[in-house]
């Protein structure tokens, strides 16, 4: 890859560390580079890397009729600047299929010996400037580099398991009803455990199926005094992996497959999201089952998470954007107990066992979950797997909804302004408007039109005419729970000397849009 400039190609290694862990981080990445140079990669490591590369090429080939224009632009630019050939994905995929299986791991290991050298080395070290904080000196770093060849190292042991994702015998459910919707072209399935599934075939992409499962409840059902655990629920619950697999082991088990699943617990809902290649649909279903039923506890992974979080929070106050975000939250929600600002001193109060309990509570009843499967779907092929895995999800027929904790954006017109010392002075301005709006397809569509029209207006008036900013971000959002509400945010950054003039233009153009609506030219482009 290029290093700082296109005239300098380099093999580079990067690490982020705690403030007091710079020496350890540097030594660790140098040890791994030297280990790879001295002993090479293992056969199993290489097989996984090759399988993942082949899968990515296969996916690109399958999507060859749906390639985005931007991808072609990138290829043309690379061809013009670097003389990179453009044979097309059909030829590239055929070539990779022929060549990749015949490239041995020894060839890659020989390349590592050429890439990791004892000369022409550059080290960049960047960190916060703080009184009392010491970093390694140039001489200390140079001494560490000289020690590389004498590091006491052993070959890497790649622990690989052939264990299936699900080792237990799953007794699946049944599809108890099936109904086609001719208006939307979808099919509704109801399973024996109460799970509802909507399947909608689309041809936007040839090698993709998207999944979303939703249930009402979320973190709103937990008391306010658990806000520290609530704030870290999504980060901590699955930090140890799922089933019998740590996160690292799971990535090994999924080598060569294109399937991923994640869980998310918001204020009023708990969700399961996933995507896969059609050929890996069963793998996505298996991951969904494990994500629902089997969060894996790993105390070591949890401690690592806490250490990373502490390092992140240590210097967050020095970041002007952190201060800006905190100020916005305070301005919108005041002293509401759920509008917490997590501090480093709070991290040790995170209760891992309690978070696992909270997670399991949210996913112990699938009977009120509705799943949506969209993409290159084959309903008849998928139905047995839907019944087996989604039909096996736990069900206790719990009838619940979210709890309204009254965390509303305050009413009225307010202006908050604060200053923070910066090396390069810059003003960040946010306008936020909120109000009641019916949550339906029409409102969401109109809001999308408004976002796009405002983007065009502000690009013309503020970026091009005034030259005052690189861009203005307009983002409207409709929410249904806990109440139907519309929030419109308009954000931009500029020279502090220009902020008042540009802010006036933002308001002027927004009021004009409210009175006149988008122009015919804008609607044509939308």
Regions found by a protein language model. Name each.
Residues 1-105, 120-127, 198, 205-294, ...:
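M16 family metallopeptidases and their MPP-like homologs
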Residues 47-51, 55-58, 78-224, 357, ...:
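Proteolytic maturation boundary segments
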Residues 298-304, 398-400:
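Conserved short beta-strand edge segments in small beta-sheet-based binding/regulatory domains
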Residues 347-351, 355:
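Alpha-helical scaffold elements lining the catalytic groove of polysaccharide deacetylases
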Residues 363-364:
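Flexible, low-complexity linker/tail segments at the boundary of structured domains
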Residues 448:
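Enzymes that process phosphate groups on RNA ends and nucleotide/triphosphate substrates
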Residues 454-455:
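Short Ser/Thr-interspersed hydrophobic loop/turn segments at strand-loop and sheet-helix junctions
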């Amino acid at each position: 890859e290029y290093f700082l400039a296109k005239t300098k190609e380099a093999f580079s290694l990067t690490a982020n560390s705690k403030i007091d862990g710079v020496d350890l981080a540097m030594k660790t990445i140098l040890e791994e580079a030297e280990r790879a140079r001295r002993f090479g990669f293992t056969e199993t490591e290489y097989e996984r890397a090759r399988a993942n590369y082949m899968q990515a090429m296969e996916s690109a080939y399958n999507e060859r009729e749906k390639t985005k224009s931007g991808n072609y632009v990138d290829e043309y630019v690379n061809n013009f600047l670097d003389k990179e050939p453009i044979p097309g994905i059909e030829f590239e995929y055929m070539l990779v299929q022929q060549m990749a299986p015949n490239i041995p791991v020894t060839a890659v290991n020989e390349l590592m010996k050429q890439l990791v050298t004892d000369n022409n080395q550059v080290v960049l070290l960047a960190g916060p400037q703080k009184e009392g904080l010491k970093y390694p000196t140039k001489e200390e770093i140079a001494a560490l580099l000289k020690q590389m060849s004498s590091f006491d190292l052993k070959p890497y042991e790649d622990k690989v398991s052939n264990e299936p994702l699900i080792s237990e015998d799953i007794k699946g459910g049944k599809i108890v009803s099936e109904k086609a919707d001719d208006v939307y072209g979808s099919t509704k399935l109801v399973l024996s455990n109460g799970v509802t599934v909507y399947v909608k075939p689309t041809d936007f992409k040839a090698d993709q199926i998207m999944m979303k499962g939703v249930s009402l409840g979320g973190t709103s059902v937990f008391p306010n005094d658990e806000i520290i655990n609530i704030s870290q629920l999504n980060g901590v619950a699955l930090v140890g992996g799922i089933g019998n697999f740590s996160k690292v082991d799971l990535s090994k088990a999924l080598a060569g497959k294109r399937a991923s699943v994640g869980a998310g617990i918001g204020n009023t809902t708990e969700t399961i999201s996933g995507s896969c290649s059609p050929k890996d649909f069963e793998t996505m279903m298996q991951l969904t089952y494990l994500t629902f039923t089997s969060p894996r506890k790993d105390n070591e992974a949890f401690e690592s998470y806490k250490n990373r979080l502490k390092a992140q929070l240590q210097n967050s106050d020095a970041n002007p954007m952190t201060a800006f975000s905190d100020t916005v939250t305070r301005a919108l929600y005041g002293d509401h107990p759920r509008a917490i600002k997590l501090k480093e001193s709070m991290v040790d109060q995170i209760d891992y066992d309690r978070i696992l309990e909270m997670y399991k509570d949210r996913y112990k009843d699938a009977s009120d979950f509705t799943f949506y499967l969209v993409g290159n779907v084959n309903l008849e092929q998928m139905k047995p797997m839907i019944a087996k895995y989604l039909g096996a999800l736990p069900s206790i027929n719990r009838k619940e909804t979210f709890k309204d904790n009254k965390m509303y954006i305050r009413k009225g017109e307010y202006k908050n302004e604060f200053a923070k010392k910066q090396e390069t002075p810059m003003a960040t301005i946010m306008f936020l408007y909120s109000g009641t709006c019916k949550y339906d397809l029409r409102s969401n569509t109109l809001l999308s039109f408004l976002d796009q029209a405002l983007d065009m207006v502000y690009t013309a008036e503020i970026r091009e005419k005034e030259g005052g900013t690189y861009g203005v971000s307009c983002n409207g959002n409709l929410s249904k729970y806990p109440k139907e509400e519309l929030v419109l945010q308009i954000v931009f950054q500029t020279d502090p000397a220009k902020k008042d003039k540009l802010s006036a233009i933002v308001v002027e153009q927004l009021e004009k849009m409210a009175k006149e609506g988008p122009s015919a030219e804008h609607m044509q482009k939308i």
